[in-house]
Amino acid sequence: MKTIEINNLRKEFKDFDLDIENLEIPEGAVLGLIGENGAGKTTLLKCILDLYRYDGDIKVFGEEIHKESFEKIGAVIPDSFFNDTFKIKDVVDILKVTYKNFDEEMFYDCADKFKMPRDKKLNELSTGNLMKLKIISAICHDPDLLILDEPTSGLDPVIRDEIIGFLFDYIKDGDKTILFSSHILSDIEKIADYIIYIHEGRLILYDEKDSLIEKYGILKTSEENLKNYGDFILKTRKNKYSTEALIKNVQVFKEFYPNEVVDRANVEDIMIFLSRGGQ
């Protein structure tokens, strides 16, 4: 079953447009949504959540999103939360009347696990604690789909690792879907099963993370040698001392050129090459 199905999505702004022809999000997977600032990541997530009007077709759990859909969806979107003078108890009171399946015991268990101070107002919480509270609030009605927009942005490595670990616990049973945008690609690599790369409002790449890392590699060579490698060269970039090429079909390339050394390409390497490469 597909958790999300997108067809011919178009959202136009004055100086930008998002145009996604087809995108299907499988059930029970973690998907890392990557792209440069302004690429359209937040716009895509807000369209899925029906926070923007758009052209095209988006189905969540096989139907157009409606009020009852949010019983099965949890979301963390920047600059969208409760009144900053609220305390944790006030947040709980609102969540109890918002979601039929809200689990107050689970909420406080998670809050205690994160050592959340119950007596502080939201505007007195640290950035890390506020993000933890947002994530707890998003999952304590047991949603099947969790949408997170930059949940680890601006946080120190220890807090980010706590949040990633918490998300791992949430998905361990295998039936939850997470769509998770971040510009911190090391976080994406830790948790994602699939990578979705958006560039200038267009879907550039969508594949399993492990498959991507196996398919692509980086070759350091001279500019003169580039012509020898034909269609294996996807993108190139040059610096003062050498030319680097993003190679596709690495295993086949090594069979043709066994003496060439191809370095592993991580998700960040692939994104940078595809967005800025010279070829």
State the predicted function of each range:
Residues 233-279:
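C-terminal coupling/interaction segments
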Residues 164-247:
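ABC transporter nucleotide-binding domain
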Residues 6-9, 16-26, 56:
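Conserved beta-strand
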Residues 56-69:
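Conserved ABC transporter NBD signature motif
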Residues 31-36:
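The feature captures the beta-strand-to-loop junction immediately N-terminal to the Walker
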Residues 75-134:
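ABC-family P-loop ATPase nucleotide-binding domains
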Residues 146-150:
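Catalytic Walker B motif of ABC-type/P-loop ATPase nucleotide-binding domains
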